[in-house]
């Protein structure tokens, strides 16, 4: 195990063993708002907050937007969950990820407030404290589970709230274990003072979203304003004015390409020009999202004519997306699969 991985595990262990911080899921905004109040409201210093909410596609949408905004010579801070390799990945600060030292320092500041928080709330405050110091142009914030009382639902006037695919993930956190309740928790508590973007949804989900947003005063942009199209073996983003080729060797499935298109729609509305977007698309990669691993110890254990594909799908929707991609491969496929008991 690498030294960096050990540092990450040690930090997670410190969080888990701290008596002030709870490992359990407990949705309540009072605790985190009290901490932020005691810290003089650092969340109010964050510019152009983009909340990314939903069940599947938050990471790929956030990552695509981050690439487009930074290609436009602007800086982003980004908060993701969960991390893949180490805790630092959760906290992007514009030029680099937070260091272990900066994370530890932030934990001590939070601990001094003597307020019981969940571990996810602590991680959210760590991001806010450090992003507030950076004054970056945009702050991209991925929601945790649901949104109504999620610790990222803190901003009255976000620049954008983007809703990716909503499905039956996180039913275990709800008293009413229905898709309707998931939709309500994710879109029923959005800001009335923002621009709401809705990603591709099943017709029933889209109908319910329409119903919930009837009384919302924000500008709402539905997914019928753009689409993913295929022509002569190539994929394109298309809206009424523009057509952009999706020139990528890293993004493979229809679901992920739709998330890329969703990001293109938002980027265009942020006045990022078409040429910048076209130049940036070939560079975008999504870790552990139908990703072909190119290096590492495992690659040395396969034959030269074999490929190693990694995907972290953990819902029915993302599993179907992976399965549909695998059906396009005209080669023998061998799989190693694991899943937690609660799925």
Predicted regions mapped to residue ranges:
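Short functional linear segments
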Residues: 1-54, 67-72, 79, 115
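ATP-dependent carboxylate-amine ligase catalytic core
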Residues: 29, 36-37, 42-47, 71-156, ...
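Acidic, Mg2+-coordinating active-site environments of NTP-dependent enzymes
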Residues: 47, 134-142, 158-279
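Residues that mark the start of a beta-strand
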Residues: 48-49, 73-75, 307, 332
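Aromatic/hydrophobic pocket-lining residues that form π-stacking "cages" and hydrophobic walls in ligand
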Residues: 65, 127, 207-210
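Hydrophobic alpha-helical packing residues
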Residues: 65-70, 131, 213, 326
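Nucleotide phosphate-binding/pyrophosphate-handling subdomain across enzymes
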Residues: 138, 149-162, 167-171, 181, ...
């Amino acid at each position: 195990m690498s030294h960096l991985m050990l540092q990450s595990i040690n930090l997670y262990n410190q969080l888990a063993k701290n008596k002030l911080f709870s490992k359990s899921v407990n949705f309540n905004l009072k605790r985190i708002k009290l901490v932020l109040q005691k810290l003089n409201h650092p969340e109010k210093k964050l510019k152009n907050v983009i909340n990314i909410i939903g069940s599947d596609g938050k990471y790929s949408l956030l990552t695509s937007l981050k690439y487009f905004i930074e290609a436009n010579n602007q800086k982003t801070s980004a908060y993701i969950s969960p991390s893949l390799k180490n805790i630092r990945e959760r906290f992007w600060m514009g030029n680099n990820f937070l260091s272990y030292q900066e994370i530890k320092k932030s934990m001590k500041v939070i601990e001094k407030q003597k307020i019981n928080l969940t571990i996810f709330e602590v991680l959210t405050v760590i991001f806010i404290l450090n992003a507030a110091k950076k004054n970056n142009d945009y702050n991209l914030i991925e929601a945790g589970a649901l949104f109504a009382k999620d610790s990222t639902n803190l901003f009255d006037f976000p620049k954008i709230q983007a809703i990716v695919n909503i499905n039956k993930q996180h039913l275990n956190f709800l008293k009413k274990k229905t898709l309707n309740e998931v939709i309500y928790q994710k879109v029923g508590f959005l800001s009335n003072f923002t621009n709401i973007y809705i990603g591709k949804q099943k017709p029933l989900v889209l109908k319910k979203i329409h119903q919930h947003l009837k009384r919302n005063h924000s500008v709402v942009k539905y997914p019928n304003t753009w689409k993913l199209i295929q022509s002569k073996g190539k994929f394109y983003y298309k809206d009424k004015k523009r057509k952009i080729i999706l020139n990528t060797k890293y993004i493979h499935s229809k679901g992920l390409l739709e998330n890329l298109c969703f990001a293109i729609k938002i980027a265009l509305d942020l006045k990022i020009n078409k040429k910048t977007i076209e130049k940036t698309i070939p560079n975008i990669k999504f870790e552990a999202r139908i990703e072909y691993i190119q290096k590492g110890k495992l690659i040395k254990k396969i034959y030269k004519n074999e490929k190693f594909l990694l995907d972290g799908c953990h819902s029915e929707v993302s599993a179907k997306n992976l399965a549909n991609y695998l059906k396009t491969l005209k080669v023998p496929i061998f799989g190693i699969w694991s899943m937690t008991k609660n799925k």
